[in-house]
Amino acid sequence: MKAVIFVVDGLGDRPDKNGNTPLKEAKTPVMDRMAKEGICGLMNSVDIGVRPGSDTAHLALLGYDPYTTYTGRGPFEACGVGVTVKPGDIAFRCNFSSVDENFIVTDRRAGRIENTSELEKELDGLKIDDVEIIFKESGGYRAALVLRGPGLSDKITDADPKKEGKKVKEIHPLDDSKEAKKTAEIVNKLLKIAYEKLDKHPVNEERRKQNLPVANMIVPRGVGQVPEIMQFTEKTGLKGACIAGTGLIKGIAKMVGLDVIDVEGCDGTPDSDFMAKACAIVETLENYDFILVNVKGADEAGHDGNYELKKQVIEKVDEMLDYITKNISKDEVYFVLSGDHSTPIEEMDHSADPLPVVLWGKSVRVDDVEKFDEFSTYKGGLNWIKGVHIMPILLDLMGLAKKYGA
């Protein structure tokens, strides 16, 4: 037996005034069929009442307790773009953002700029005092930052104000150590250098001419050091792969030892080649026991407050599932369909609202759920579970779970 965990990033939502969500209103005949043929429930990827990051959520779905393994988003983001994060390195996730001359954020994602490779070159390889700056774009407005040098600490604050109209935050140490103080000073110096180098860069001058938001600032967050983490194959006995479009998910996969399968045209946006990813899933199952799949577009639509786009992305995902389920055997593959977190249209951010989940495959205890959405699956036989329960359930069904006790 093989297994797939298929994550529709940002899937869940809250009902609008008519009681609808993008998922409830979308035409999803395949998701609904899987709900009828599988066992359903609700899932909080991290815990009840906890707003998950995509990082902590995916760790949990892979069977890792995020409360003991998570050290910050930065190391995963850096790993995802090919940077080897060494012990002692300090890593961050960054956004390219638009700011005014007072560092007031006018667009947190720089108009969702598509290509920042030329801007990356302005910062990668810099040296501030005795610290090397490693800076890599991670797709669109996303980037990874690594500080490498002696005497650094991750005990510092983030720069992200999290809202437009607010000033980029000055970095402060979180303890009295000289290492934390030094690291905060280095990052603050870097932010000033970044603005000086990026604001008048030809890429941004051209964007101004086109009346587009400029990418004239980097905003670091999610600071952390490389975690100690058991490899997935050692933990589960499965040979695993990952198919995802974003650096963060690729980084998590690489760090736990999953092989990352790159698919041309799949960049994590609503315009990705969804069917290319579907084909890749079917092909990859021929050589692997397990695949983690992340489809990102619905999350971007949720962050932008775009109800119609989120619904359209979900319908594209349903078309993917149509192809996949027609080309795999239910008797050979267990398939988990859910999200990593809700990204409600009204919030335009992650929320703790639970997600619909269905487990589809042979010998599951089929319940009477007939539709896959936030309101129907709560009646299902899985009841209300956490993300860390998914892998143990799969391993048990696959005959790989170890007995607890005599």
From Swiss-Prot:
Alphabetical list of Pfam families matching this protein: Metalloenzyme, PhosphMutase
Gene3D superfamilies in the record: Alkaline Phosphatase, subunit A (3.40.720.10)
GO molecular function, one term: phosphoglycerate mutase activity
Listed InterPro entries: Alkaline_phosphatase_core_sf, ApgAM_prokaryotes, Metalloenzyme, Pglycerate_mutase_ApgM
Key words, A-Z: Glycolysis, Isomerase
Enzyme Commission number(s) of this protein: 5.4.2.12
Biological processes annotated in GO: glycolytic process
Function: Catalyzes the interconversion of 2-phosphoglycerate and 3-phosphoglycerate.
The UniProt record lists the keyword Cell cycle: no
Class in the EC hierarchy, top level: isomerase
The protein's name in its UniProt record: 2,3-bisphosphoglycerate-independent phosphoglycerate mutase
Domain of life: Archaea
Keyword Kinase recorded: no
Pathway stated in the Swiss-Prot or TrEMBL entry: Carbohydrate degradation; glycolysis; pyruvate from D-glyceraldehyde 3-phosphate: step 3/5
Similarity comment: family membership: Belongs to the BPG-independent phosphoglycerate mutase family. A-PGAM subfamily.
